[in-house]
A protein has these predicted regions:
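Primarily NTPase-proximal linker/entry elements flanking Walker-type ATP/GTP-binding cores
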Residues: 1-56, 63-83, 91-99, 104-108
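Short low-complexity stretches enriched in small and charged residues
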Residues: 31-35, 61-64, 119-122, 146-147
Length: 204
């Protein structure tokens, strides 16, 4: 049984100990990871949680600007440094900011590609070691079928994520990749992305 996850409950639980709830998003480039992060941020904001976002993909050209565009539209605080800077340090900065400003949630964007797959996994492992997230979410493209299942398997082996978001989907996409991901990772899919707008994210 992959179990169920109630994000709101978990955040409130952490909030009662006066600590921010930290979510790290993982997945390869092109899957809609950054957009999914923005959708989750918007959802949390609508639930009246305060949110800060860490631009810890310091590898891909344009990644920081893309995230900044989302945070500008959503009127959210972003913590960013320069390209090539240590992503774990960026994530840590965001957590420190959240602690000192009593922010409820820290959402961390991470790289989806580096020189090698092992570089990428090491980097994500370092981020998780430094910030000790409450939740790691894998983002996969529902249209990529087996590729997505293989990515999920690989990421899960290396970084043990807690749950997944499937993008480019529709609310009825309960078959195929979704079932396989749940099976190979023994972890639930919590949301599916069903469109381009910030509200286009639904519980699975």
């Amino acid at each position: 049984n992959a179990g169920q996850i109630d994000l709101k409950d978990r955040i409130n639980e952490k909030k009662s100990s006066n600590q921010p709830f930290i979510i790290v998003f993982v997945g390869i480039n092109g899957t809609g990871k950054t957009t999914s992060l923005a959708k989750v941020a918007n959802m949390l904001k609508n639930e009246k949680f305060s949110v800060v976002i860490a631009a810890a993909d310091t590898y891909r050209a344009g990644a920081i600007e893309q995230l900044r565009e989302h945070t500008n539209r959503l009127n959210l605080k972003i913590i960013a440094q320069n390209y090539g800077s240590d992503p774990a340090a960026v994530a840590k900065d965001a957590v420190l900011y959240a602690q000192s400003h009593k922010v409820d949630c820290v959402l961390v964007d991470t790289a989806g590609r580096m020189q090698t797959s092992s570089n990428l996994m090491e980097q994500i492992a370092k981020i998780t070691k430094v910030v000790n997230p409450d939740m790691k979410i894998f983002v996969g493209d529902s249209l990529a079928g087996n590729d997505t299942v293989n990515q999920a398997r690989e990421f899960h082996k290396q970084v043990k994520f807690d749950c997944s978001i499937l993008t480019k989907s529709d609310a009825d996409a309960r078959g195929g990749a979704a079932l396989s991901i749940v099976k190979v990772t023994s972890s639930p899919i919590i949301y599916v992305g069903v469109g381009q707008e910030y509200d286009d994210i639904v519980k699975f």
